[in-house]
Amino acid sequence: MIFKVAVLQMRSENRAVEENSKTIIKYMTEAKINNADILLLPECFMTGYDLTINNDAAISESDLASLCDKAKELGVGLVATALTKGNAKPQNAAFVIGKHGEILMKYAKVHTCDFADERVLEPGTEFRVCDFDGVKIGIMICYDREYPESARILMLKGAEIILVPNDCVSMRPRLQALSTRAYENMCGVAMANPNGKNAGNSCAYSPICWDDNDECVDNTLLLADAETAGLFYAAFDMGAIRQYREREMMGNTFRKVKAYSDLLSDEIQYPFKRSRK
């Protein structure tokens, strides 16, 4: 079974939900023509990454109706991203829409960038996994991927593929980290980032890092340049990935969880203390 992800590398417009939705539908159609199973958008694509949006102006699930209808019509999935209504403040969220137009999952970004303007958002409280057409999908949004715990929890919850809506620059260390997340969790990873100078580099990595003869293989399935806008594709061989996961020693095979209690401490020590504004 091949699970094909269409990765959109493009920047959307701020506060232009209708126009951005038309762009999404255009690329959903192109993704379907190219036999993709799902279209992955960059972070906050529907609304734009406009942190002046208040909770009243943020979108809700009802605003996804046209995209759900198009997903059903085309038979292609979508990871839709937007600033959405939270309990008191907006959330940075992703919705996984299935091929029949159903919303399979909403995930709100847990690791909001509290060192920057994103501190005004309401963070999510859990990592989530859903079943998409027989493939277990987890979501990390941008800064989530800087914390290995994010991908590890998704793996523990059964994720086989982790999709990453993203919006940032200086991508080289982030690419290395995403490849490592794929390797250490034995999960496929795909990331969509807006194009631009020092940006872009949308990517995908297989968890398969060596062959049956223990020879290293390049696990890069996709690595876009910085400035090209448009769709890129990554094909995950789920049969090969599942066989690899059944025999190799990463993931949840030999963890020593009794030694991990310090991971649950919320104490922050030097040199990691920061002022909280």
Regions found by a protein language model. Give the residues of each.
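Structural motif
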Residues: D37-I38, I137, I161
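Active-site catalytic loop in hydrolytic enzyme cores
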Residues: K85-K157, N166, R172-T180, C187, ...
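Extreme N-terminal starter segment of soluble prokaryotic enzymes
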Residues: M1-V7
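Cys-nucleophile CN-hydrolase/nitrilase-fold catalytic domain and related Cys-dependent amidase chemistry
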Residues: E13, V17-S21, I25-H100, K106, ...
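Short, charged, solvent-exposed linker or helix-capping segments at domain edges/interfaces
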Residues: V17, I59-S62, M105, N213-C216, ...
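C-terminal beta-strand edge segments of enzyme domains
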Residues: V129-D131, P194-K277
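Residue-level signal for short segments within beta-strands and strand-turn junctions
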Residues: Q9, G98, S206-I208
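CN hydrolase (nitrilase-like) catalytic-core segments centered on the catalytic cysteine
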Residues: E61-V79, E146-Y233
